[in-house]
């Protein structure tokens, strides 16, 4: 059996990229893909670049905001549900799969109203509001981190990552080929992380010395936050707004210093690279700390809260492992935690639901 699968994801790359990986798998199995996103969402252009049709709902954030947003939220939600229901009636999908984002909630609710089965995939160690609600309506619930939903019916499939990352050479062989000073890859995310851009260069010099090699992804329009600091310190650093080839960057690095979004944690594990996670302290439900602990509690990563990001704490965390051979051991343990076939597992369960099994 084939048919149309409605993929509901948007808002951040952490929702969209895992959804794209599963969509690619479903497409190879003969399903047509229709994407459901939000008007003016980042997913619009990205999804079209991957060759998928996208429909957009008039919907925005439901959680947080001022009194006006709280008062209008029920009406905006109802409007989005009605829009989604009209689309579903017209296109008759055999399955709706929600990954999170503004459109996922209204789309999932509309799907259930139209008697279309729903599958939910939660990327983080703590489910977001939309997925917590949708999981009560879903036929199958999928977890990126085992135990996220806290009930045995949920299926742990991991977080899908790009195949170029899972295809990287094994860490021990890769690290053995690295030459020169330690290679440090700093990832601030697509929007950048001010504390990593402004504070980390001086801390790296103080803790690891001048011989290190640095690549620093600082976020759109934020090169001026980091590049002049490296230059003033005399540190060898390549600063860029974005990194197009993440697989190559992970393969180059001995150590990654980054936030702990679900996708980043999954990529670190899949690549097999040592990482120091500095979780975003304002993340909802502190989910980034819990994401990072999935690896750090297994000796497969390092974890340092942002409030402790100073020379003394950073030295205490990094100096005991600041040798390429020791970092390679952490990288090996990280890769042992990866689920390389996550996209295939998720697609198989989706296919079974779509086929009524």
UniProtKB/Swiss-Prot annotation:
Topological relation to the membrane, as annotated: Peripheral membrane protein
Annotated localization: Cell inner membrane
GO CC entries: plasma membrane
Keyword field: Cell cycle, Cell division, Cell inner membrane, Cell membrane, Cell shape, Cell wall biogenesis/degradation, Glycosyltransferase, Membrane, Peptidoglycan synthesis, Transferase
Pfam families according to UniProt: Glyco_tran_28_C (PF04101), Glyco_transf_28 (PF03033)
Broad enzyme group: transferase
Biological or metabolic pathway of the protein: Cell wall biogenesis; peptidoglycan biosynthesis
GO terms assigned for molecular function: UDP-N-acetyl-D-glucosamine:N-acetylmuramoyl-L-alanyl-D-glutamyl-meso-2,6-diaminopimelyl-D-alanyl-D-alanine-diphosphoundecaprenol 4-beta-N-acetylglucosaminlytransferase activity; undecaprenyldiphospho-muramoylpentapeptide beta-N-acetylglucosaminyltransferase activity
Binding site for UDP-N-acetyl-alpha-D-glucosamine: 12-14, 124, 162, 190, 243, 262-267, 288
Disulfide bonds: none
GO biological process: carbohydrate metabolic process; cell division; cell wall organization; lipid glycosylation; peptidoglycan biosynthetic process; regulation of cell shape
Catalytic activity: di-trans,octa-cis-undecaprenyl diphospho-N-acetyl-alpha-D-muramoyl-L-alanyl-D-glutamyl-meso-2,6-diaminopimeloyl-D-alanyl-D-alanine + UDP-N-acetyl-alpha-D-glucosamine = di-trans,octa-cis-undecaprenyl diphospho-[N-acetyl-alpha-D-glucosaminyl-(1->4)]-N-acetyl-alpha-D-muramoyl-L-alanyl-D-glutamyl-meso-2,6-diaminopimeloyl-D-alanyl-D-alanine + UDP + H(+)
Matching Gene3D superfamilies: Glycogen Phosphorylase B
CDD domains: GT28_MurG (cd03785)
Predominant location: membrane
EC number: 2.4.1.227
Similarity section: Belongs to the glycosyltransferase 28 family. MurG subfamily.
Function: Cell wall formation. Catalyzes the transfer of a GlcNAc subunit on undecaprenyl-pyrophosphoryl-MurNAc-pentapeptide (lipid intermediate I) to form undecaprenyl-pyrophosphoryl-MurNAc-(pentapeptide)GlcNAc (lipid intermediate II).
HAMAP family xrefs: MurG
Name of the molecule in the record: UDP-N-acetylglucosamine--N-acetylmuramyl-(pentapeptide) pyrophosphoryl-undecaprenol N-acetylglucosamine transferase
Organism encoding this protein: Alcanivorax borkumensis (strain ATCC 700651 / DSM 11573 / NCIMB 13689 / SK2)
